[in-house]
């Protein structure tokens, strides 16, 4: 009995072991039959945790790489500014003011160029523009001026002390320029979902030949001068009325931005000192600057700037800027002679004695007339490039604050004008599409002379080859000045002969030159002068040989 009782627990243990083994084998078989479920159940949380960690690590790596690249880019920019664009380090570079001006100009040319299309600026370019402009403008935060203020002590006594505050011109104009900058970028961002698109001129010519729409190509002759610009296209029915109103509103806003940028730029240029090198390069006489014909008209009693401009050949931009340079140089030459005092110890020649006989009031009168002529010329051609004096001021300017304001306003002026020009192109195409059966003028927009104009800013030999952004004619939202081709008077020899004879007849001698400062002639004198010009035009139309 004892042996049998001892063997019973052993048998039970073996049975339990066999049952455990069988259960384990069945469990293993079940696991083998459904391996995917167990693998998914056990591996999914681990793999998800690893993927999240990898994504976070990649993001951190990208951020660190971008920060390193930004730091390296900032080091490169400021190294060029400190070296004055002279990479040899020998100290032959340009001054800091000109280096900052060149940097802002080149940055705008790199990111915006000619602004071929009305479309949002890519995010990378927008971030690069804001980041690098912030780097270049940060120096203005440390340009201050000392002003006296009164400080009150606890015992009631007052003491006058000098405190620092931002310089007045930067404090007023720089925030305004930043606001204009943001507004221009917002206007570009608004052209995201549009009813128009752009087609390259080669593709457009192929499509026109295929569908027979040669009239559209023929009417769009203005684009032939700028073959690189794509041509805007709209649907056959044209733009919707709401879209056209929004487009016109954007044009008006951009035009106001353009006027504000031009005003800041002109004020800044006027505040810059005239370089001595420019004054030394002027000739000794105003007649040498203006030429005999313009000088005789200015020194005459019958002087009218508008009539004088009508008889001059202003058919091209080159001729207009040449006359502007000559008139501007004569203005400063006469002012220089008025303010200068002749030396009494040196022996003068008879020619210098005759020049000294001319009264200072008469020289100022001539300078005032030349200024009125230059003003009329700029009003007739508001998009003229910078004159030789303006470029000389930019080149020899030492004031960093004025250099920042001038270059920043100039690039915003260029960007705003390009936006206005592209909107005018689009509005013209829309009008052409809506009224394809009517006779449409073959000039685009409100101004027929829309060729790009670059501002030639003098740079050093060490500057990276680049160009200033285009600066084209301003088109006012209220009144648009006509292009040279529209108001150009036929420059026959009879016009100049009659006008010269009329002026010569009434031309006074220098000693009889009036002392009054008025630069405008009476209405009767101007009417008589215009009458002579009209008669000469009628004669030239009847007989071209006269």
Swiss-Prot record:
Gene3D superfamilies: PRONE domain, subdomain 1
The keyword Cytoplasm appears for this protein: yes
UniProt subcellular location: Cytoplasm; Cell membrane
InterPro entries tied to this protein: PRONE_dom, RopGEF
Annotated ranges, domain PRONE: 61-440
Keyword Transcription regulation in record: no
Entry's Gene Ontology molecular function annotations: guanyl-nucleotide exchange factor activity
Pfam families, A to Z: PRONE
Biased composition (Polar residues): 35-48, 463-480
GO biological process: plant-type cell wall organization
Record region (Disordered): 1-48, 463-491
Protein role: Guanine-nucleotide exchange factor (GEF) that acts as an activator of Rop (Rho of plants) GTPases by promoting the exchange of GDP for GTP. In postembryonic roots, modulates root stem cell maintenance by regulating the expression of PLT1 and PLT2, which are key transcription factors that mediate the patterning of the root stem cell niche. May connect RopGEF-regulated Rac/Rop signaling and auxin-dependent PLT-regulated root pattern formation.
Free-text comment on this protein's domains from its UniProt entry: The PRONE (plant-specific Rop nucleotide exchanger) domain is responsible for the GEF activity.
Further comment found in the protein's record: Plants silencing ROPGEF7 show defects in embryo patterning and maintenance of the quiescent center (QC), and postembryonic loss of root stem cell population.
Protein name as annotated: Rop guanine nucleotide exchange factor 7
């Amino acid at each position: 009995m004892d042996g049998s009782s001892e063997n019973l627990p052993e048998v039970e243990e073996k049975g339990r072991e066999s049952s455990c083994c069988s259960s384990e084998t069945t469990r293993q078989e079940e696991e083998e039959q459904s391996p995917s479920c167990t693998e998914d159940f056990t591996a999914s949380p681990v793999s998800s945790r690893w993927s999240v960690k990898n994504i976070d690590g990649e993001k951190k790596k990208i951020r660190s790489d971008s920060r390193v690249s930004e730091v390296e880019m900032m080091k490169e920019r400021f190294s060029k500014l400190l070296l004055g664009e002279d990479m040899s380090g020998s100290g032959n570079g340009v001054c800091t003011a000109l280096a900052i001006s060149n940097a802002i100009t080149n940055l705008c040319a790199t990111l915006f160029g000619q602004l071929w299309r009305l479309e949002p600026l890519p995010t990378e370019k927008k971030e690069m523009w804001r980041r690098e402009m912030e780097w270049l403008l940060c120096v203005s935060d440390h340009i201050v001026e000392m002003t006296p203020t009164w400080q009150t002590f606890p015992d009631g006594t007052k003491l006058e002390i000098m405190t620092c505050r931002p310089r007045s011109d930067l404090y007023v104009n720089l925030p305004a320029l930043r606001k204009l900058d943001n507004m221009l970028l917002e206007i570009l961002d608004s052209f995201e979902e549009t009813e128009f698109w752009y087609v390259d001129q080669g593709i457009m010519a192929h499509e026109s030949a295929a569908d027979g729409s040669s009239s559209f190509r023929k009417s769009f002759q203005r684009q032939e001068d700028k073959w690189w610009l794509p041509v805007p296209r709209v649907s056959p029915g044209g733009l919707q009325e709401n879209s056209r109103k929004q487009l016109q509103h954007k044009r008006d806003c951009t035009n106001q931005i353009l006027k504000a940028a031009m005003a800041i730029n002109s004020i800044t240029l006027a505040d810059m000192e005239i370089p001595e090198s420019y004054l030394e390069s002027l000739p000794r006489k105003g007649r040498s600057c203006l030429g005999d014909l313009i000088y005789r008209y200015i020194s005459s009693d019958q002087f009218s700037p508008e009539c004088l401009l009508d008889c001059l050949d202003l058919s091209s931009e080159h001729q207009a800027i040449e006359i502007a340079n000559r008139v501007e140089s004569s203005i400063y030459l006469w002012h220089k002679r008025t303010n200068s005092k002749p030396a009494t110890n040196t022996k003068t020649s008879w020619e210098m004695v005759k020049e000294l006989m001319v009264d200072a009031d008469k020289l100022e009168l001539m300078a005032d007339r030349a200024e009125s002529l230059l003003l009329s010329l700029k009003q007739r051609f508001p998009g003229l490039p910078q004159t030789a004096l303006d470029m000389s001021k930019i080149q020899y300017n030492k004031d960093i604050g004025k250099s920042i304001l001038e270059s920043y306003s100039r690039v915003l002026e260029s960007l705003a004008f390009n936006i206005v020009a592209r909107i005018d192109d689009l509005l013209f195409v829309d009008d052409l599409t809506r009224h394809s059966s009517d006779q449409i003028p073959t000039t685009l927009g409100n101004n027929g002379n829309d060729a790009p104009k670059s501002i030639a800013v003098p740079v050093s030999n060490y500057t990276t080859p680049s160009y200033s952004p285009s600066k084209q004619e301003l088109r006012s939202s209220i009144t648009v000045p006509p292009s040279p081709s529209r108001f150009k008077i036929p420059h026959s020899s009879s016009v100049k002969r009659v006008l010269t004879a009329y002026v010569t007849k009434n031309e006074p001698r220098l000693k009889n030159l009036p002392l009054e400062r008025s630069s405008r002639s009476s209405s009767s004198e101007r009417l008589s002068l215009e009458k002579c010009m009209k008669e000469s035009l009628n004669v030239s139309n009847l007989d071209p040989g006269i």
